[in-house]
């Protein structure tokens, strides 16, 4: 009998700590029999990360035998998984209840198990999504309640991960998936997994809450080429084992069929082929399969409507007719955004297919490309909108069938954490290496179960910790160098290889190029390379055979590269020590290790461990730091591919510049111009060809140099061998700030393409900083030796002498006694621009620059600073300090200042004669305003301003420079009397001039 129970509210008095991920320290005590003995343990990592986890107590040790309650009502597969775990850990199940034993209660929400509700103490799976569960371990009891049978099974998997050496923390967990369908599509080309591999994988999926396994191996003939034919009897037995194992582990076994290679759609032949499709599905249905997929991927035929019609008919006549089959799954012929969409609109096939295919059918797509760096939310939104449904993802990582020499050992990376808004079905395509695929699959389980809390770095570390135990740290060192998949053409995916180590390498090159001390960093890198070799040797000696068989060649490859990296450091140290013999010895080792690595099938750490050797072999202490060089080109390709000119001087052999080839193409002539950060004495240009293609490889060149970027002098012309090796163009030392490489010939991988394209991985310059001659100079300062109080004095400043430079700008500070002088203004001379500012009392900063583009003249006054003498002072000092000039190269040179003494004497005050204004009259009369004008008095010595009156009342005082005033806000057609008087500095006011008038009507 079953009934739905009302769950009691949580009343626990324990302090709770919420966690999302990671390790938690807690105290564990034994329950039942209390010993009083306490030990510190860790709540282990869990995968996938639970949605909610609370620590509610100290934890306890599970007794050697337990009371098991609910096993008859609970999901059979969940109980079987629990019993298997208990047996493996030597924990027996009591035949009768023992109050001194740990009690474990298990069941689903609808089961009538009072003990389960009591142990849950208010925590419940009742309101969770399908496949959710609640798990409570507290006070010697463990309760696992599933929302459904799948949820109970997943609760058992979490319980298994929680228990370490019979210790379990006291926790409350409520957990449920973000994405409904989570799992694997075995859809890679190449060697299919063995039957043993698949059985092992299916168990692994169940343990990590993955519920979908799509059986679609490209090299299974009965899936693709022989899709019409039934499986032979021996194959049917194998298939039955997979189906049964999937059911036991709560994994939907999805049988995939790919009929598109030769299916017939019309007439009797079409009907015959459709019946073959039904018959194939019927045979699998009879074996227990309840999920099916029909794929149209990787075929030439683009009959969109017919593809969709086959699906719709199969959906009606088989899927819906059966009643217990899950929604049909498909992959269209256009299955990535690049193929599906053009200019934001669906292409013809995708539009017709999307309009025709039944809304209940799951449609898979791979993201922006077939193998791509990311799925941004915008991309998912676009495709979901076209198909008007939540999409299913076929994520092509960690698959390696397009780049077989490398292993993909990284985490899920580049996937938006809000993807579940448009996706409710997430699968990954694994490698043919089943065991090593588990690292990425482990992180895929975490991402798809708890998307919002996914952290790719934590997930990756946790996966390796849980999969490799004592070898985890060694495996992290190895796998860290094999996470990025990049076949140099259309496929790029995964986290970059060893990003922290790559950053240290880049820092080393920067320090060496900048002539900084790099000794500590070199020692650190020696340690890194030694650790790489040690880790790989440990793995070779201790990895289980199934894993070692899959990675032994890559382990050997990384050992070789680590040895080459150490030899590369030896080369650098020898260069620093100017030890030619040691350098040549280390160089030979490094080159041999690189050659061995490049000739191997195995690929690993191309842009890190391998690239470091290549960089070291081409490194020269005379190399001018590429990252300080500004580089421009006759053209660059930034539309068809990301290949700007800057990539030819970034220190990275894996990037490159390409002349513009997208429409409209630039077919020549081609050139690169490098602007150095200073003037150098150069003698060599390095050209590193693009490493992944010969297209645009430079075979003819002309090198020219310049000091000003406009006038270039040719220093070398010649030809280069047509291969991928680094080339050096050497010539007699010459001074240069600009270096131009003109392409006179290049090769192409296209017919008639010679000379039309140009590429370069790196173009670098070697030389030494030009030691500039010392620039010296002095300042001139001209002023009268004596000035009267109240008078202005002009202080003329210029460049007296300048040696080994020409000045295009001049910056100085004029200092004066603020009690003796007041700053008035600065005056420029012809052909120069002067900008002056009083920066504080007694200091004026003056900037002088050329207006003509010619150098500033020497031995001339360039600027005049006007000061007013304010007080009698004997021997007041004027000085020029902080004096510097800017030359034509943009360099600044300090030059010597100077000083001068000026005496300020009392002056005789001139006689002030008071006179009235002249010609006082109205120039404009309006209704409300009257404007009056006048001429200044006959004598102006001491004149300070004017006082204006209206009808006998003073209305304004204005300055002496004014000769007009407007009386405003007057009444219309009214008589007014206006007067004006001149005011003088001795306090006297002149007689008033008068004017009477009437405003306008």
Curated annotation (Swiss-Prot):
Residues the record marks as active site: 298
CDD domains cross-referenced by the UniProt entry: cohesin_like (cd08546), FN3 (cd00063)
Gene3D superfamilies tied to this protein: 2.60.40.680, Chitobiase/beta-hexosaminidase domain 2-like, Galactose-binding domain-like, Glycosidases, Hyaluronidase post-catalytic domain-like, Immunoglobulins
Pfam family, one: F5_F8_type_C
Job of this protein: Binds carbohydrates. Capable of hydrolyzing the glycosidic link of O-GlcNAcylated proteins. Can bind and deglycosylate O-glycosylated peptides from mammals. Can use p-nitrophenyl-beta-GlcNAc and 4-methylumbelliferone-GlcNAc as substrates (in vitro).
UniProt region (Catalytic domain), positions on chain: 179-469
UniProt-annotated binding residues for a protein: 187, 218, 297, 335, 394-396, 401, 429
Catalytic reactions on record: 3-O-(N-acetyl-beta-D-glucosaminyl)-L-seryl-[protein] + H2O = N-acetyl-D-glucosamine + L-seryl-[protein]; 3-O-(N-acetyl-beta-D-glucosaminyl)-L-threonyl-[protein] + H2O = L-threonyl-[protein] + N-acetyl-D-glucosamine
Family indicated by similarity: Belongs to the glycosyl hydrolase 84 family.
GH84 domain: residues covered: 180-452
Domain Fibronectin type-III: 916-1001
Entry EC no(s): 3.2.1.169
Top-rank taxon: Bacteria
Keyword entries, A-Z: Coiled coil, Glycosidase, Hydrolase, Signal
GO molecular function: [protein]-3-O-(N-acetyl-D-glucosaminyl)-L-serine/L-threonine O-N-acetyl-alpha-D-glucosaminase activity; carbohydrate binding; hexosaminidase activity
Coiled coil found in the keyword field: yes
Gene that encodes it: nagJ
Signal peptide region: 1-30
GO BP terms: carbohydrate derivative metabolic process; polysaccharide catabolic process
Keyword Signal included in the entry's annotation: yes
UniProt-listed PANTHER family: O-GLCNACASE, PROTEIN O-GLCNACASE
Protein's name in the database: O-GlcNAcase NagJ
Coiled-coil segments: 515-543, 573-597
InterPro entries, per database record: CBM2/CBM3_carb-bd_dom_sf, Cohesin_dom, FA58C, FN3_dom, FN3_sf, Galactose-bd-like_sf, Glycoside_hydrolase_SF, Glycosyl_Hydrolase_84
């Amino acid at each position: 009998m079953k009934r739905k129970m009302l769950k009691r509210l949580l009343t626990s008095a324990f302090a709770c700590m919420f966690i999302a991920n990671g390790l938690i320290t807690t105290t564990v005590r034994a329950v039942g029999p209390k010993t009083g003995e306490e030990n510190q343990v860790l709540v282990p990592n869990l995968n996938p990360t639970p949605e909610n986890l609370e620590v509610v107590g100290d934890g306890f040790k599970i007794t050697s035998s337990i009371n098991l309650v609910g096993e008859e009502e609970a999901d059979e597969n969940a109980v079987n998984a629990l019993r298997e775990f208990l047996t493996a850990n030597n924990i027996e199940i009591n035949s009768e209840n023992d109050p001194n034993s740990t009690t474990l209660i298990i069941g689903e929400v609808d089961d009538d198990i009072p003990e389960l509700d009591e142990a849950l103490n208010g925590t419940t799976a009742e309101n969770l999504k399908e496949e959710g569960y609640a798990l409570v371990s507290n006070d010697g009891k463990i309760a696992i309640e599933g929302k459904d049978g799948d949820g109970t099974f997943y609760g058992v998997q979490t319980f298994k991960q929680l228990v370490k050496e019979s210790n379990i923390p006291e926790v409350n967990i409520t957990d449920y998936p973000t994405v409904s369908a989570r799992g694997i599509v075995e859809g890679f080309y190449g060697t299919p997994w063995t039957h043993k591999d698949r059985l092992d994988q299916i168990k692994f999926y169940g343990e990590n809450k993955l519920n979908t396994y799509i059986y679609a191996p490209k090299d299974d003939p009965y899936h693709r080429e022989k899709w019409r034919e039934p499986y032979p009897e021996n194959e049917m037995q194998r298939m039955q084992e997979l189906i049964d194992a999937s059911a036991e582990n709560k994994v939907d076994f999805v049988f995939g069929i790919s009929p598109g290679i030769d299916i017939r759609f019309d007439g009797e032949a079409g009907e015959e082929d459709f019946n073959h499709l039904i018959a194939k599905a019927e045979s699998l249905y009879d074996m227990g399969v309840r999920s099916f997929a029909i794929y149209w991927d990787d075929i030439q035929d683009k009959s969109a409507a017919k593809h969709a019609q086959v699906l719709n008919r199969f959906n009606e006549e088989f899927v819906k007719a059966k009643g217990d089959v899950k929604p049909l799954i498909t992959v269209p012929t256009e299955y990535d955004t690049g193929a599906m969409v053009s200019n934001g609109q669906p292409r013809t096939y995708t539009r017709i297919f999307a309009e025709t295919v039944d809304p209940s059918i799951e449609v898979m797509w791979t993201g922006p490309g077939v193998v791509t760096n990311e799925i941004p939310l915008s991309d998912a939104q676009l495709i979901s909108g076209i198909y008007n449904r939540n999409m299913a993802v076929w994520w092509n990582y960690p698959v390696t069938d397009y780049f077989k020499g490398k292993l993909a050992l990284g985490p899920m990376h580049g996937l938006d954490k809000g993807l579940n808004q448009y996706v409710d079905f997430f699968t990954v395509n694994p490698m043919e290496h089943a065991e090593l695929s588990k690292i990425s699959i482990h992180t895929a389980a975490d991402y798809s179960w708890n998307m919002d809390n996914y952290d790719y770095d934590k997930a990756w570390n946790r996966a390796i910790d849980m999969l490799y135990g004592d070898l985890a740290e060694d495996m992290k060192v190895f796998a860290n160098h094999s996470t990025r998949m990049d076949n140099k053409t259309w496929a790029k995916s995964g986290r970059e290889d060893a990003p922290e180590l790559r950053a240290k390498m880049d820092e080393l090159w920067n320090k060496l190029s900048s002539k900084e001390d790099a000794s500590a960093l070199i020692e650190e890198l020696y340690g890194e390379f030694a650790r790489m070799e040690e880790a790989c040797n440990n793995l070779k000696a201790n990895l289980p055979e199934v894993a070692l068989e899959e990675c032994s060649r890559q382990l050997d490859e990384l050992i070789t590269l680590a040895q080459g990296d150490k030899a590369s450091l030896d080369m650098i140290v020898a260069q620093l020590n100017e030890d030619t013999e040691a350098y040549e010895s280390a160089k030979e080792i490094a080159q041999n290790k690189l050659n061995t690595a490049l000739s191997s099938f195995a690929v690993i750490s191309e842009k890190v461990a391998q690239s470091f050797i290549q960089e070291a072999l081409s490194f020269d202490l005379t190399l001018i730091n590429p990252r300080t060089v500004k580089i421009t080109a006759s053209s660059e390709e930034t539309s068809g591919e990301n290949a700007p000119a800057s990539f030819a001087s970034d220190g990275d052999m894996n990037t490159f510049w390409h002349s513009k080839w997208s429409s409209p193409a630039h077919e020549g002539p081609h050139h690169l111009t490098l602007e150095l950060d200073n003037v150098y004495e150069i003698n060599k240009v390095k050209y590193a060809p693009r490493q992944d293609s010969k297209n645009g490889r430079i075979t003819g060149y002309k090198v020219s140099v310049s000091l000003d970027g406009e006038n270039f002098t040719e220093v070398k012309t010649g030809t280069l061998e047509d291969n991928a090796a680094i080339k050096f163009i050497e010539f007699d030392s010459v001074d240069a700030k600009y270096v131009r490489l003109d392409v006179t010939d290049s090769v192409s991988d296209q017919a008639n393409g010679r000379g039309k394209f140009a590429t370069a991985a790196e173009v670098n310059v070697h030389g030494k900083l030009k030691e500039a001659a010392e620039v010296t100079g002095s300042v001139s300062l001209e002023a009268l030796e004596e000035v009267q109080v109240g008078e202005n004095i002009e202080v003329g400043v210029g460049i007296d002498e300048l040696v080994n430079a020409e000045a295009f700008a001049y910056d100085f500070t004029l200092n004066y006694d603020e009690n003796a002088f007041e700053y008035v203004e600065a005056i420029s001379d012809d052909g120069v621009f002067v900008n002056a500012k009083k920066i504080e009392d007694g200091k004026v900063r003056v900037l002088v620059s050329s207006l003509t583009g010619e150098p500033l003249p020497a031995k001339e006054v360039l600027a005049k600073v006007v000061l007013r003498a304010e007080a009698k002072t004997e021997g007041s000092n004027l000085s020029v300090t902080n004096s510097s000039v800017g030359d034509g190269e943009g360099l600044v040179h300090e030059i010597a200042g100077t000083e001068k003494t000026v005496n300020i004497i009392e002056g005789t005050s001139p006689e002030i004669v008071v006179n009235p204004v002249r010609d006082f009259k109205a120039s404009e009369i309006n209704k409300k305003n009257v404007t009056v004008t006048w001429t200044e008095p006959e004598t102006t010595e001491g004149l300070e301003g004017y006082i204006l009156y209206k009808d006998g009342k003073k209305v304004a005082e204005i300055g002496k420079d004014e000769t007009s005033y407007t009386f405003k806000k007057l009444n219309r057609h009214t008589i007014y009397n206006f007067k004006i008087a001149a005011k003088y500095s001795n306090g006297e006011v002149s007689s008033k001039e008068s004017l009477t008038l009437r405003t306008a009507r």
